[in-house]
Amino acid sequence: MRCPTCKYNGTRVVDSRPADDGNSIRRRRECEKCGFRFTTFEKVEESPLIVVKKDGAREEFAREKVRRGLIRACEKRPVSAEQIEEIVNEVERELRNIGDSEIASDLIGEKVMNKLANLDEVAYVRFASVYRQFKDISVFVEELKDLMEKNKDR
């Protein structure tokens, strides 16, 4: 690997350990010429997931979009950045485990809502109100009733 400082092509691995829950390897490297130390990450290259939108349009799955939606829903709620990142990781892992290269956008939204329902009810309602595009208050109230019923069963 090329040194980012002097561009010499010879480096040696000083330390290697699992990262990202075993999904990647973090390596500390040292340039054999100038001694500069830097970190690299090695990760399996995965084939892209294609999201099929409601209008039939297709685009590559973007973790950042899921993360932004979660951050917005969890704003001013007792949900940590680590919990949000874990939801993003779980949703992506579940989608990849389906084994299909094309995923309906509805499925992504449902998976995120299921995770939020178990984590924070207010964040769940916020996300659901945007995702399900509540047209009026009666639909919103119905969603709240469903959530309250589910909580009785817990």
Swiss-Prot record:
Ranges for domain ATP-cone: 49-139
Pfam families reported for this sequence: ATP-cone, Zn_ribbon_NrdR
Zn-finger (unnamed) residues: 3-34
MF terms (GO), sorted A to Z: ATP binding; DNA binding; zinc ion binding
Cofactor note: Binds 1 zinc ion.
Cofactor(s) this protein cannot do without: Zn(2+)
Keywords assigned by UniProt, alphabetized: ATP-binding, DNA-binding, Metal-binding, Nucleotide-binding, Repressor, Transcription, Transcription regulation, Zinc, Zinc-finger
PROSITE patterns linked: ATP_CONE (PS51161)
Superkingdom of origin organism: Bacteria
UniProt GO BP: negative regulation of DNA-templated transcription
Function of the protein: Negatively regulates transcription of bacterial ribonucleotide reductase nrd genes and operons by binding to NrdR-boxes.
Recorded family membership: Belongs to the NrdR family.
Listed HAMAP family: NrdR (MF_00440)
Name assigned to this protein: Transcriptional repressor NrdR
Protein source organism: Listeria welshimeri serovar 6b (strain ATCC 35897 / DSM 20650 / CCUG 15529 / CIP 8149 / NCTC 11857 / SLCC 5334 / V8)
